[in-house]
């Protein structure tokens, strides 16, 4: 294969074996190094390609470049709340910052920045308000209309302004189950049949709604009762993704060890109850188990529940679970993580980590 070089140099000589004719592109004004051109060796070859020492100007938008600059050094996501920085300026979202401090406390080590290994603590690190404001101005897509808005305005747009946001009929109180985009609401309400139903028909619907309301009140009353217990503990937990060692690996999640009620615990989670190919299912669920790692002198009966953490917006319906932990029986069964639907589950799976808050209530005999 012939090689044509307009000017000898190490850049051109290193292109041997690429299966293409090589030349160099003229740079206007003679400034800077010449750029290497790869031309197809015959008419049936692939389209023309150019190797650039850097991307074409304007090929990557500014906001896309800023994502990698302003992301958290730990989870690599854009922070959703406060942004902290180490003494060398490396950025951490509030959730990861708290977890670094908690992990160091459990290991009896000094917490360090994952980038530069300088010491970090609540007194050594400070918030970076400039970065927080910059992130709030970065564009983000509305999940309903797919238009872009600054992050600071997105929540208001989704709740109050978006014409495609999911809304409910005003006759929901008398049993209308309709849900749809906001721009169809007026047409539906003008045609809704519920206002014309008889009293007897409405009574049946209202009875069903009363039963649902009664179950919700039982849950909240149970939570209020648990809050009166003597021994209550809570902590922020971070589920991190791992893969099994099987021939066909499976995704699972596990938290670092944490301490609640003077005991050491671990949480594990799995997708679709570890079914063989969860990627082929349109329905996504997460289930979790609580594991007691420390030894206990007597059976330890506990109630526990997971809620959304302070730095995330995942939608979870609280469910109270109960278990008696002993040295021989220290793992609960896998129980459902009460996410409202598969869409919310996919949001969690798409994130680098899953941040939640765990409450444990010890039942005294």
UniProtKB/Swiss-Prot annotation:
Pfam families reported for this sequence: Sina_RING (PF21362)
Keywords per UniProt: Cytoplasm, Metal-binding, Zinc, Zinc-finger
ZnF bounds (RING-type): 72-117
PROSITE patterns the UniProt entry points to: ZF_RING_2, ZF_TRAF
Entry superkingdom: Eukaryota
Cellular component annotations (GO), alphabetically ordered: cytoplasm; nuclear envelope; nucleus
Ranges annotated as TRAF-type zinc finger: 113-186
Record GO terms (molecular function): zinc ion binding
CDD domains in the record: CYHR1_C (cd22861), RING-HC_CYHR1 (cd16505)
Subcellular location field: Cytoplasm
Region of interest: Disordered: 1-56
Annotated family: Belongs to the ZFTRAF1 family.
Assembly mode: Interacts with LGALS3.
UniProt protein name: Zinc finger TRAF-type-containing protein 1-B
Organism: Xenopus laevis
Gene name per UniProt: zftraf1-b
């Amino acid at each position: 294969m012939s090689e044509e070089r307009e000017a000898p140099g190490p850049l051109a000589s290193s292109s041997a074996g690429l299966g293409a004719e090589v030349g160099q592109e003229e740079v206007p004004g003679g400034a800077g190094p010449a750029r290497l051109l790869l031309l197809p060796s015959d008419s049936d070859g692939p389209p023309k390609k150019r190797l650039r020492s850097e991307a074409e100007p304007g090929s990557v938008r500014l906001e896309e470049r800023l994502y990698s600059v302003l992301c958290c050094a730990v989870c690599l996501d854009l922070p959703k709340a406060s942004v902290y920085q180490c003494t060398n300026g490396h950025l951490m979202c509030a959730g990861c910052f708290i977890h670094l401090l908690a992990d160091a406390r459990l290991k009896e080590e000094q917490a360090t920045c994952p980038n530069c290994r300088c010491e970090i603590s609540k007194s050594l690190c400070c918030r970076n308000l400039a970065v927080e404001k910059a992130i709030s101005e970065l564009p983000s897509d509305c999940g309903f209309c797919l238009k872009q808005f600054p992050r600071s305005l997105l929540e208001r747009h989704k709740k109050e302004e978006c014409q495609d946001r999911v809304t409910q009929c005003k006759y929901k109180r008398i049993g209308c189950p309709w849900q749809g985009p906001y721009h169809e609401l007026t047409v539906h309400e003008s045609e809704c049949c519920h206002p014309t139903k008889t009293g007897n028909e409405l009574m049946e619907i209202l009875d069903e709604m009363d039963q649902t309301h009664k179950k919700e009140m039982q849950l909240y009353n149970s939570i209020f009762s648990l809050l009166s217990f003597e021994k209550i503990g809570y902590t922020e937990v971070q589920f991190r993704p791992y893969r099994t060692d099987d021939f066909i690996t499976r995704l699972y999640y596990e938290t670092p060890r944490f301490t609640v009620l003077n005991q050491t615990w671990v949480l594990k989670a799995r997708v679709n109850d570890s079914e063989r190919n969860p990627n082929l299912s349109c329905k996504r669920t997460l289930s979790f188990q609580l594991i007691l790692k420390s030894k206990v002198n007597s059976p330890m009966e506990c109630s526990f529940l997971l809620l959304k953490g302070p730095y995330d917006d995942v939608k979870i319906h609280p469910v109270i679970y109960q278990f008696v932990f002993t040295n021989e029986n220290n793992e609960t069964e896998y129980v459902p993580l009460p996410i409202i639907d598969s869409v919310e589950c996919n949001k969690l799976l798409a994130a680098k980590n899953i941040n939640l808050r765990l409450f444990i209530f010890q039942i005294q005999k």
